[in-house]
């Protein structure tokens, strides 16, 4: 029987050891380095992994012999990522809130109020990526009174956003030219581009920073997948920002961790049915009966079973066998 180790929430770590009785279910968050040696064959770990931007974690999972089923690559037939949606909704909203906070002069920003006031223009926000995070960020920023621009490479998605978002949100097709044009007077940039299971593309390079005004705030929600900005590196809630060439970078890898009461409930609502299926049926039968869950298999008993992860690290890929 497989020991099941899974995260029902994004932010709370309840048990600190995998060495428990057989069939015990541990509530666990994303693995950290001191815990790698505790992983072993016979365990199913169901949580966020983001292996495409963490070689050390990938190697540890392969070495462990455990079955690693990643929340972020569970994907339904209509291309939805149901276990990313709740955290994306939280992170997108928080991205605009945090961007507005660090736009204050006392925090290194330009000293602008997101909404402006009568007779004074509001802040300008550029959202890169029109997925769940981007839509949530744009909607929140618009609700705060900002002038918002959102980019994507899908025209059908841009049409949908144009129809559904408030009038102070404008859609742009994502090209380097269009992005550079908006950077000249932007106040906040939210990076929210996602390639499922793969590294995020760098849409803003270091040389593009000089086109922005000092005090511009970059919020990189895609930092878990390597980040949308070339100058991004992961930060923490205790030390969330840093500056590069006068540009404020916010790149906290677990943004929803700041609002655990909301994010815990939201993620539990999405993950519980999958966790129960794994516990009741075993991982092979559960993945055999649910194609979305099958796509979550990233590493199985020493083999990488998610192609994007294998390709990023130049490792052998082998489809998971669940028959």
Please name every model-derived segment.
Residues 2-20:
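N-terminal low-complexity segments that are often proline-rich with Ser/Thr-Pro
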Residues 72-113, 122, 223, 228-323:
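Adenosine-phosphate binding glycine-rich loop
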Residues 163-245:
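Rossmann-like adenosine-cofactor binding region
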Residues 25-103:
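Phosphate/diphosphate ligand-binding glycine-rich loop within oxidoreductases
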Residues 26-30, 49-50, 193-197, 222-223, ...:
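Short glycine-/small-residue-rich Rossmann-like dinucleotide-binding loops
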